[in-house]
């Protein structure tokens, strides 16, 4: 049986409009939730994006 991959995929969700705008990958051993300030095309401004499951 194959080993489990160390890379997991997740989406970045806008905190203002709750749209999933970006999809990223990270190492499974990194336990902290990722928070990035990125551009939201729906809000038309830079907002805080937090990690959420796909």
Swiss-Prot record:
One of its GO terms (cellular component) is ribonucleoprotein complex. The gene is rpmG. Belongs to the bacterial ribosomal protein bL33 family. GO terms for molecular function: structural constituent of ribosome. Gene3D superfamilies: Ribosomal protein L33. The keyword Lyase does not apply. It comes from Petrotoga mobilis (strain DSM 10674 / SJ95). HAMAP family: Ribosomal_bL33. GO terms for biological process: translation. NCBIfam families: PRK00504.1, PRK00595.1, rpmG_bact. Signal peptide: none annotated. This is Large ribosomal subunit protein bL33. Pfam families: Ribosomal_L33 (PF00471).
